[in-house]
Amino acid sequence: MANRNRSTRYNLKSYSNSERQTTMRRMVSYLRTLANRRSSGVVTADDAHTFLTREGVNIGQVRTRLSFINSAFSGEMFERTGTTRSTRPQAKGRAISAYTLA
């Protein structure tokens, strides 16, 4: 019996510039709304990962996800306020940055 490669295969989606800009605009809007709804006003990368999962960005597309997240939080909209613990299963307990609206 042949030994099969059991690694998970992903259908990697590539984004055009317009798709990327649209997704970024929607993610920043989502994060802004979420920050306004919370009494602490804090949003994290976990919140961005939740949005990207709902948008269909595969969990295996690490570079794509990080690119979206870094772009969203590096803009003028958010200020880094400290660190908190991640609640995502993939990063359980790791320290991640917390952001508030600028």
List where the protein language model places each region.
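Basic amphipathic alpha-helical segments that dock to polyanions
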Residues: S71-G75
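Long, low-complexity, charged/polar intrinsically disordered regions in eukaryotic proteins
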Residues: M1-T22
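Short, positively charged loop/turn segments that connect secondary-structure elements
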Residues: T53-F68, R80-Q90
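Short amphipathic alpha-helical segments
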Residues: V28, A45-H49, L66
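Positively charged, polyanion-binding regions of nucleic-acid-associated proteins
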Residues: S16-V42
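Short acidic, hydrophobic short linear motifs in intrinsically disordered regions
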Residues: S39-T53
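Short, cationic-aromatic polyanion-contact patches
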Residues: R85-A102
